[in-house]
Amino acid sequence: MSLAYNIPQYSASEASYTGNITEWSWKYGPGDTENTYAFTYDKLSRLTDTKQYVNGAVSDLFVEKNLSYDRNGNIRTLNRTETGELFHAFSYGYTGNQLTTLSDGAADYAYAYDRNGNMTNDGMNGLKVVYNRLNLIEKV
C-alpha cells in the first residue's frame, strides 16, 4: 500500500502541497492487480470526487462523486457509483454539527445523541449505544 501527496502517478490527481492524499494504491497480494484511488479536493481541502484505476486504466467500479458541503464543512450530499451506475445517493441532515438524518434514496435513517453529545442511536446500522458516567461506551 502506498499514499501519494505531492507527486501523483495518474493525471486525474493534482499535486497537493497541503497534506491532502492525492492517491492511494494497493494490491491484495504479490502479483495481484494494482488498484488506485485518485482524490480531488476543492479550495478548502474538502473531498469532491474520486476516480479509480486498475493496473493504470480508469475503472468505474466504485467511485464517489458530487460531494457537497454546508457552511460548517459537513457533507450534505455524496453520490456513489458502481460500474458507472448510481448505487447510492446520500443526503445528510444536521442539527448544528451533529448528523441527525441520513437518506440513501431508499430509506431515511435517524441519529440521536445524549446531552453530552455522544451518539446514542445509529439508525443506518441499527445500533443503540449506552454510555457510563465517564462518557465511555458501556453497551452496544
Where in the sequence are the language-model features?
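Acidic/glycine-rich beta-solenoid
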Residues: 1-140
